[in-house]
């Protein structure tokens, strides 16, 4: 039934061997299968069933007789009772019954949660003596049981093999362990002289670990031999079962209460082995166990195998191991019975976390001090027995390994000292954190003494030679700010208090694996030390690591990761003398590198059946998160992350293995890559610093220079949202595609019909369509007003043409109706300052207005009376009431007409004509009323009735006279009314006509009055006639060009916004083209436009003169100006046209240049815009960016003007002039002719003299040209960006006597005259140079060196003249220097001003 457990559990590597149990008097039984590292699921399974092959250890437990040391050690290990069970126990029971009872007891211990005993005395004792369960390699269940019981507990167990009373005592003991106990050190333990020598005081309560977990992991293992005295090196127990010591008899009620409490919290759940062993969630400690178990098997070949650690076994070890100042001893691996070598486990310090937990539990254990004293006594006795066994075994093994031990002592001596120092530092650091002083300080002192004693014992233990199975997790300290180096030190400390050889190897291994990117350096040394070291040190190291992680919580996921690491591990065969060490990171692959205060401890891997030495080292804190410090370790960690290895801990089996070599290569390559990256980054930083330095320097030199970060960027203008801009083009495209016309066989595209949509609302002030509509309405109104009286008075409407009259009448009515229903209903209006465009509101506004009433009256349907009274035109008189449309049309038309006064004159004339029209109609009606031709006054009916009547009306209204006198009363009244109308009304209209005409000529009148006043003023002061003529000319030109004398008068009444709009429309197109203002803020230019003044200059007027103070800048609006220069100041240097600007240098006042540098004269009538310096400064205050830009441009222009002129260097200057005496002699010789000439030599000399004279003349001319050019450049600086137009200038006259041909001429006859005409191929040097006034375009190419060749005095002799202008580089350099000087001076001036 229980056979499946055997298949699951690991098997021992060799045949059962005997352990030293002769003292106990029990026969050695076959060794149990090693189960030190069984996972939690194995322990759970063992609770249910145990393989029959594993004998019970109960009898051996009973047979064990513990001395005072043994009891002391057992007293030290009450929390480690299960650790003893986890260790390999020998087959101590010869009877099946004892085996079954032992198995049942173990199962119960596994099931029942075991609290961690936190009593300080027991912890110290466990740290000092490492309970016999841990120190004796062949420790039996009896010893395991006495770990926490009184001295009589083990004899009673030896006598009573039955588990009943023992089980009850064990329950009581474990209950006491779980309950808080007051920290008290038993005097028996204090009396022991070897307590302090065995190890440092455990600062933290290592007894908090569940002993249940230990019991679950080791149901039966070989029992250890009797302990040896403490004075000698205590050999650690061989792999045995560290059976939990029975607790002293306590209150059963407390036990039942505890059981009920634990059952309520949680029941242990079975765990699948494949997942690394999961422990109960209620386990007080879930830290992984790091154990170094030594198999005392055959020493032929040792394999380094990475085994999985059982968490329950590890927790048991945490309770019993003495690692990190904890009283717990690590579990002993299963030992072969043939070589029952007991290896003692050294105590280690407990991490700070465990100490804190101990403190919390110690506060709860105040009421159990007496019970602790009894357990302390038992532990002391157990420890004494274990020490005796250890010493005996050390003596036997010491003789064999003296030589090897001495060598290893020399190598590891230094390491031991370092370990001791670190242990002391850690103990001191932890001691500071402990809030409880007295008891804890004493425990630390005892722990340190124990460590020293253990080190002495380890010297002899190192001599032992046996195969080692090293299953340890080097758990780094769980400090938050711990670096990689501190982790390696902690790992080295794991074995420091144990066998120093092994500890040194483990320390070197951990340090090298962390700091050297886990290279293989020192691997052989570590392996040899591990192989040569005794199991005592190894077990101690594992115990320390167990203690480090003992107070940490263990998660199921972490256990699964540990089993995955187990799957990757494999044993490597090695020799006995040089065992190979396989080091792998069990969980670094899945753990982040960030610190965590309470990291879960690693899960102990199960032992492999192979005989091997395996060191499982988690490179990072297993299950913990590390927070790294910025040090070299960070770079190493970065290299690890970059390397192909998934884990930061590299596994190696031999120093020369290919894997290690590859790792070294990868580390080297990544290091080189990192160095290259760092170099690149440094170079980039240097470059950035240089750029910043240059910017700061430039800013200090020139304050106008601003960086992109400092200069405020103008906020972009907010654009109005465009309604669906993308949809319209698409629609337009569709419309274009649709408009195709097919005609016959051709298909061509036609223009689409324009779609006009009637507006929803109409602006009556600006809508031209509405004005056009009003024009039609006024036409209809005039039809009615003019023709209704005619049709009524004159007989022009007859039955033959009545239909035409009616057609026109009703057409006018239709226009009226459309105006009311369509247009007037859509007119916008203003209400409360808002323009109302709502249709309903507009309709309501029109309906409520006076105009609507008049429109309704004019459309009264009086035409229906035609049916009764006939067609009478007087019935249409209401149509004339639409006079409001007429007046509105007049206003709208005047607003859009450029010359409104013309329309006003026409309209006034129309009023006069209409009044005459009405009078003529009335006169015909009066004549018809009395009878045509009846009297002399009436119309006689001859000729055109309308024309005759109209003429009579004109004579009557104008009161010209000459009309016939009225005879009847009717005629007298009618004529009186006509006269009255003509005198009163008609005179008013004539006066209005005068006003209209006067208004039309008001400007001209003002111009005349101003001119007359000015002429009167000049005559009064007797101004010269020339000046008066120029003034009159100015008046006339200004009036004709502008239509007014002063534009500013018109702008005064307008608001600023309107003035700006007008100025933009008039002047912006000109100012925006000025190169000086390009790039400036647009708003600045707008503000500047309002400050511009328009001035007209007459021909030859001086705009500015050289040397005067410049306060204005000029922009040419129309006309031209000429820049004059030269020696006389009258040479035209350049002509500026419209759009050019000059005077800006003086205006900006850069470098103190406020004086004019040239004369500027108006060429013809010129209209200039003038910008005053004061106005510009006021504007630039609000635009600092534009100010800086303008100043830069002005400096550049000034620098160009002040450029040094190119000076030609004459390397071979011409010869000096001929002395006068020599000239006289030549003249005399010339007169002598051929006699003194010697074949024409004198003629040649005469020609040479003429050439020299020509050279002198050319030099003088060149001087004059250079002066002219200098003045011209100064004038060009004034012009700014003007487009120069060089007028044609007369070139300087060529020298009269150029040089002769360069080739030697033939000898001339004496009578031959001197050659007057020079050869064209050999002009003199001056003739080669073009005048400086010519532009560069006249010279196609400028050579750096100019060479001129002339004839010498001798025909065969030639003179070489070379001109070398200055180099361009030197020019640029000089320009830069001058620019820097100017900028520096300007910056200083500004600072002084500020």
UniProtKB/Swiss-Prot annotation:
Cross-referenced Gene3D superfamilies: 1.10.287.70, Helix hairpin bin, Jelly Rolls
Region (Disordered): 1-95, 112-253, 271-675, 699-732, 1265-1394
Annotated catalysed reactions: Ca(2+)(in) = Ca(2+)(out); Na(+)(in) = Na(+)(out); K(+)(in) = K(+)(out); NH4(+)(in) = NH4(+)(out)
TM stretches of this protein: 763-793, 799-825, 838-861, 873-887, 901-922, 932-974, 975-1002
Main localization category: membrane
Feature: compositional bias, Polar residues: 68-86, 116-125, 654-675
Protein's GO biological process: calcium ion transport; monoatomic cation transmembrane transport; positive regulation of gene expression; potassium ion transport; retina homeostasis; sensory perception of smell; sodium ion transport; visual perception
Tissue/organ expression: Retina, testis, kidney, heart and brain.
Segments of this protein annotated with the region Selectivity filter: 959-962
Region entry Calmodulin-binding CaM1, spans: 671-681
Residue ranges with Low complexity bias: 493-508, 529-554
Stretches of the chain found on the membrane's Cytoplasmic side: 1-762, 826-837, 888-900, 1003-1394
Membrane topology term: Multi-pass membrane protein
Single GO MF annotation: sodium channel activity
Annotated protein name in UniProt: Cyclic nucleotide-gated channel beta-1
Gene: CNGB1
């Amino acid at each position: 039934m229980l056979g499946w457990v055997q298949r699951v559990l690991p098997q021992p590597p060799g045949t059962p061997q005997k352990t030293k149990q002769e003292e106990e008097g029990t026969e050695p039984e076959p060794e149990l299968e090693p189960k030190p590292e069984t996972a939690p699921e194995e322990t759970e399974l063992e609770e249910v069933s145990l393989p029959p092959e594993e004998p019970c250890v109960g009898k051996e437990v009973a047979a064990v007789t513990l001395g005072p040391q043994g009891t002391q050690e057992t007293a030290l290990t009450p929390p480690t009772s299960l650790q003893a069970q986890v260790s390999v126990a020998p087959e101590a029971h010869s009877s099946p019954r004892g085996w079954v009872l032992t198995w049942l007891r173990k199962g119960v211990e596994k099931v029942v949660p075991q609290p961690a005993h936190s009593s300080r005395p027991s912890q110290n004792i466990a740290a000092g003596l490492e309970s016999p369960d841990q120190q004796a390699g062949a420790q039996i269940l009896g010893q395991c049981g006495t770990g926490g019981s009184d001295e009589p507990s083990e004899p009673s167990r030896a006598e009573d093999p039955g588990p009943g009373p023992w089980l009850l005592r064990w329950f009581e003991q474990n209950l006491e362990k779980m309950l808080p106990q007051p920290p008290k050190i038993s005097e028996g333990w204090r009396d022991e002289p070897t307590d302090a020598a065995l190890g440092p005081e455990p600062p933290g309560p290592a007894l908090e670990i569940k002993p249940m977990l230990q019991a679950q992991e080791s149901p039966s293992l070989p029992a250890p031999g009797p302990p040896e005295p403490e004075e000698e090196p205590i050999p650690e127990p061989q792999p045995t079962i560290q059976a939990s010591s029975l607790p002293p008899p306590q209150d059963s009620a407390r036990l039942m209460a505890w059981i009920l409490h634990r059952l309520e919290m949680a029941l242990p759940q079975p765990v699948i082995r494949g997942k690394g062993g999961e422990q109960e969630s209620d386990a007080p400690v879930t830290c992984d166990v790091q154990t170094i178990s030594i198999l005392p098997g055959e020493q032929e070949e040792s394999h380094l195998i990475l085994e999985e650690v059982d968490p329950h076994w590890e927790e048991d070890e945490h309770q019993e191991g003495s690692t990190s100042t904890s009283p717990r001893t690590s579990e002993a691996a299963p030992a072969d019975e043939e070589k029952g070598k007991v290896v003692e486990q050294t105590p280690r310090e407990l991490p700070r976390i465990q100490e804190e937990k101990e403190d919390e539990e110690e506060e709860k254990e105040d009421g159990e001090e007496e019970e602790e004293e009894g357990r302390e006594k038992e532990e002391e006795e157990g420890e004494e027995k274990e020490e005796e066994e250890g010493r005996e075994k050390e003596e036997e093994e010491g003789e064999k390994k003296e030589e090897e031990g001495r060598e290893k002592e020399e190598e590891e001596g230094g390491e031991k000292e370092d370990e001791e120092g670190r242990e002391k530092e850690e103990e001191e650091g932890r001691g500071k954190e402990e809030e409880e002083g007295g008891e804890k300080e004493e425990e630390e002192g005892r722990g340190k003494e124990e460590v020293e004693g253990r080190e002495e014992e380890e010297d002899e233990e190192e001599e032992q030679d046996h195969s080692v199975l090293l299953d340890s997790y080097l758990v780094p300290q769980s400090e938050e700010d711990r670096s990689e180096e501190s982790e390696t030190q902690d790992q080295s400390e794991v074995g420091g208090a144990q066998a120093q050889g092994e500890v040194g190897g483990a320390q070197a291994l951990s340090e090298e694996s962390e700091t050297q990117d886990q290279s293989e350096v020192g691997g052989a040394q570590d392996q040899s030390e591990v192989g040569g070291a005794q199991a005592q040190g190894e077990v101690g190291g594992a115990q320390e690591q167990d203690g480090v992680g003992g107070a940490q919580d263990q998660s199921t996921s972490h256990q699964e990761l540990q089993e995955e690491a187990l799957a990757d591990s494999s044993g490597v065969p090695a020799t006995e003398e040089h065992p190979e060490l396989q080091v792998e990171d069990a969980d670094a692959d899945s753990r982040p590198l960030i610190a965590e205060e309470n990291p879960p401890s690693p899960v102990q891997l199960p032992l492999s059946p192979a005989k091997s030495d395996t060191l499982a080292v988690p490179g990072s804190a297993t299950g913990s998160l590390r927070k790294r410090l910025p040090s070299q370790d960070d770079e190493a960690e970065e290299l690890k992350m970059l390397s192909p290895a998934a884990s930061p801990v590299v596994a190696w089996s031999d120093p020369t293995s290919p894997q290690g070599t590859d790792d070294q290569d990868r580390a080297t390559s990544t290091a080189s890559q990192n160095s290259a990256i760092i170099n690149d980054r440094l170079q980039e930083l240097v470059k950035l610093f240089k750029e910043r330095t240059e910017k700061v320097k430039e800013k200090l030199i020139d304050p106008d220079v601003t960086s992109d970060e400092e200069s405020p960027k103008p906020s972009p203008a907010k654009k109005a949202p465009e309604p669906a801009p993308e949809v319209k083009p698409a629609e337009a495209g569709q419309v274009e595609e649709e408009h195709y016309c097919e005609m016959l066989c051709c298909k061509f595209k036609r223009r689409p019909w324009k779609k006009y949509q009637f507006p929803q609302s109409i602006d009556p002030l600006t809508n031209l369509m509405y004005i056009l509509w009003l024009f039609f309405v006024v036409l209809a109104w005039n039809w009615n007003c003019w023709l209704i009286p005619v049709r009524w008075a004159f007989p022009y409407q007859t039955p033959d043409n009545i239909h035409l009259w009616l057609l026109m009448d009703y057409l006018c009515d239709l226009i009226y109706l459309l105006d009311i229903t369509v247009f007037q209903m859509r007119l916008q209006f203003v209400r409360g300052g808002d323009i109302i465009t709502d249709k309903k509101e507009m309709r309501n506004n029109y309906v409520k207005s006076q105009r609507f009433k008049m429109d309704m009256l004019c459309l009264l349907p009086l035409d229906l009376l035609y049916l009764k009274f006939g067609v009478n035109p007087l019935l249409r008189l209401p149509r004339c009431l639409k006079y409001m449309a007429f007046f509105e049309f007049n206003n709208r038309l005047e607003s859009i007409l450029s010359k409104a006064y013309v329309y006003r004159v026409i309209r006034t004339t129309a009023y006069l004509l209409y009044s005459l029209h009405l009078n003529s109609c009335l006169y015909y009606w009066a004549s018809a009323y009395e009878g045509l031709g009846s009297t002399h006054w009436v119309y006689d009916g001859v000729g055109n009735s309308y024309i005759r009547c109209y003429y009579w009306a004109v004579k009557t209204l104008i009161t010209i006279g000459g009309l016939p006198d009225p005879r009847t009363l009717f005629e007298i009244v009618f004529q009186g009314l006509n006269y009255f109308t003509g005198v009163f009304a008609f005179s008013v209209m004539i006066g209005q006509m005068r006003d209209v005409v006067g208004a039309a000529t008001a400007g001209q009148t003002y111009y005349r009055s101003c001119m007359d006043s000015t002429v009167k003023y000049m005559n009064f002061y007797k101004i010269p006639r020339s000046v008066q003529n120029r003034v009159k000319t100015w008046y006339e030109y200004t009036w004709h060009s502008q239509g007014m004398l002063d534009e500013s008068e018109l702008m005064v009444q307008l608001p600023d916004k309107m003035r700006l709009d007008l100025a933009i429309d008039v002047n912006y197109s000109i100012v925006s083209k000025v190169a000086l203002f390009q790039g400036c803020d647009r708003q600045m230019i707008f503000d500047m436009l309002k400050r511009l003044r328009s001035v007209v200059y007459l021909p030859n007027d001086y705009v500015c003169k050289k040397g005067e103070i410049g306060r204005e800048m000029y922009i040419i609006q129309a006309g031209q100006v000429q820049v004059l220069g030269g020696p006389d100041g009258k040479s035209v240097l350049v002509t500026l046209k419209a759009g050019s600007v000059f005077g800006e240098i003086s205006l900006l006042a850069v470098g103190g240049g406020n004086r004019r540098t040239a004369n500027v004269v108006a060429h013809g009538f010129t209209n200039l815009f003038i910008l005053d310096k004061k106005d510009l400064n006021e504007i630039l205050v609000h635009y600092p960016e534009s100010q800086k830009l303008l100043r830069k441009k002005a400096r550049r222009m000034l620098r160009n003007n002040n450029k040094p002129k190119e000076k030609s260097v004459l390397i071979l200057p011409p010869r000096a002039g001929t002395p006068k005496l020599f000239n006289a002699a030549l003249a005399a010789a010339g007169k002598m002719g051929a006699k003194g000439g010697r074949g024409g030599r004198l003629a040649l000399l005469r020609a040479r003299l003429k050439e020299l004279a020509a050279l002198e003349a050319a030099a003088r001319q060149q001087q004059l040209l250079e002066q002219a050019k200098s003045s011209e450049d100064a004038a060009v600086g004034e012009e700014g960006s003007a487009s120069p137009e060089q007028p044609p200038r007369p070139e300087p006259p060529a020298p009269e006597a150029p040089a002769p041909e360069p080739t030697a001429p033939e000898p001339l006859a004496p009578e031959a005259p001197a050659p007057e005409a020079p050869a064209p191929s050999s002009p003199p040097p001056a003739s080669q140079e073009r005048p400086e006034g010519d532009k560069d375009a006249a010279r196609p190419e400028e050579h750096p060196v100019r060479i001129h060749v002339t004839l010498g005095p001798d025909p065969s002799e030639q003179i070489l003249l070379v001109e070398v202008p200055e180099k361009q580089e030197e020019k640029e350099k000089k320009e830069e220097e001058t620019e820097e000087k100017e900028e520096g001076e300007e910056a200083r001036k500004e600072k002084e001003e500020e």
